[in-house]
Amino acid sequence: MKDTKNLLEFWETQMKQSHRSSNYFFRKSPSHYHMMLLVMSAHKHEQELSVEELKTKLFKTSRPKSAIIITEAVEKGFFHLEKTSIDQRKKFIKPTNSFVKEFDNYIITLKNLVL
């Protein structure tokens, strides 16, 4: 029972912060959350992730819907796009510094959650 209570308290705390952070945006749908995990995984492993690769990796999400979610994440300041010097058409998606800090805090909180 304590595990369930801890998880519930964690979730409620996260949702209270939703108007001030990325919590609400990335919990809108499984696709939003999956996108966050894909971008952050690439970032943490120092891998390049192109917008096209991200669209392909998002399961059960159409390419137009993926493009909309990516655009929203960029507009809200969670991610930014970088062009390569070799091919100006290819854009890599990267988290902003502020989002990296938010994500790191989220992971620390999850790790400290005693289940």
State where each predicted segment sits.
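Short alpha-helical segments that sit at the start of domains
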Residues: 9-38
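Phosphate-/nucleic-acid-contacting segments
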Residues: 52, 59-63, 87-91
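Short, cationic-aromatic polyanion-contact patches
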Residues: 84-107
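Amphipathic alpha-helical dimerization/coiled-coil segments
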Residues: 18, 104-115
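Short acidic, hydrophobic short linear motifs in intrinsically disordered regions
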Residues: 45-57
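A short, conserved structural fragment
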Residues: 74-84
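Short helix-to-turn junction characteristic of helix-turn-helix DNA-binding domains
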Residues: 39-43
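Short amphipathic alpha-helical interaction segments
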Residues: 60-75
